[in-house]
């Protein structure tokens, strides 16, 4: 086994990478509140895993979406557990994201030279809220339908571009199959990809600049 490890280590310098990760200096002022960002990331991983599992059974059509969710909850082995994990980790992700933003703001973690880290964090916060908005509609029940209708109707108040923006979000004049397809694509592909990219940038900047000092 050691020969296999040595072979990879000679080519990839695994030991050096491991030493760098495990020997990073942690300032003495760091407390449990500095772990909230990591909890948010953990919730995201749970979302990805449970959401991926549900894509095998969910059908993104206005006629079958609700029935497919019921099927997941009642007929799929541990489907109720997977969807419950997805639901509660989503709520936890939003909560911990808000707490993380407050912690960073109150401790001055947004100040020079960490402005870009703050910017990527704000973008991730927007992605998190967008996950909630798009995911809420996917069961396509009465609550989801009317939530989509209200949310997509908000831009209509914007002068000039309001109406075209509403039509772009809905995929037409009214809320229907095109709307559900758009929200499903955003929820399962676009937003996870954007979140992963900005999380990577966020983590790399934290790794490079370290944890901000005390007030």
Curated annotation (Swiss-Prot):
GO biological process: photosynthesis; respiratory electron transport chain
Family note: Belongs to the cytochrome b family. PetB subfamily.
Compartment(s) where it occurs, according to its Swiss-Prot or TrEMBL record: Plastid, Chloroplast thylakoid membrane
Transmembrane segment boundaries: 32-52, 90-110, 116-136, 186-206
Subunit architecture: The 4 large subunits of the cytochrome b6-f complex are cytochrome b6, subunit IV (17 kDa polypeptide, PetD), cytochrome f and the Rieske protein, while the 4 small subunits are PetG, PetL, PetM and PetN. The complex functions as a dimer.
Membrane topology designation: Multi-pass membrane protein
SUPFAM superfamilies attached to this UniProt entry: Transmembrane di-heme cytochromes
Remaining remarks: Heme 1 (or BH or b566) is high-potential and absorbs at about 566 nm, and heme 2 (or BL or b562) is low-potential and absorbs at about 562 nm.
Keywords, ordered alphabetically: Chloroplast, Electron transport, Heme, Iron, Membrane, Metal-binding, Photosynthesis, Plastid, Thylakoid, Transmembrane, Transmembrane helix, Transport
A molecular function GO annotation: metal ion binding
Annotated heme c binding sites: 35
Protein name: Cytochrome b6
Glycoprotein listed as a keyword: no
Pfam families: Cytochrome_B
One Gene Ontology CC term in the entry: chloroplast thylakoid membrane
Role summary: Component of the cytochrome b6-f complex, which mediates electron transfer between photosystem II (PSII) and photosystem I (PSI), cyclic electron flow around PSI, and state transitions.
């Amino acid at each position: 086994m050691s020969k296999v490890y040595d072979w990879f280590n000679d080519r990839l310098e695994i030991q050096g990478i491991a030493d760098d990760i495990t020997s990073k200096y942690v300032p003495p002022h760091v407390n449990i509140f500095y772990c909230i960002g990591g909890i948010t990331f953990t919730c995201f991983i749970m979302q990805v895993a449970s959401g991926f599992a549900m894509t095998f059974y969910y059908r993104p059509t206005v006629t079958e979406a609700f029935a497919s969710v019921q099927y997941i909850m009642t007929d799929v082995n541990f489907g109720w557990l997977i969807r419950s994990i997805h639901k509660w980790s989503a709520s936890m992700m939003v909560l911990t994201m808000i707490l993380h933003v407050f912690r960073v703001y109150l401790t001055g973690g947004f100040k020079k030279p960490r402005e870009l880290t703050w910017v990527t964090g704000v973008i991730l916060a927007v992605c998190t809220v967008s996950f909630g908005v798009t995911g809420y509609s996917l069961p396509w029940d009465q609550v989801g339908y009317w939530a989509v209708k209200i949310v997509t109707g908000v831009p209509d108040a914007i002068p000039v571009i309001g109406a075209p923006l509403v039509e772009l979000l809905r995929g037409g004049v009214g809320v229907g199959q095109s709307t559900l397809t758009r929200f499903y694509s955003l929820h399962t592909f676009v937003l996870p990809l954007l979140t992963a990219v900005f999380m990577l940038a966020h983590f790399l900047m934290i790794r490079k600049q370290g944890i901000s000092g005390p007030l």
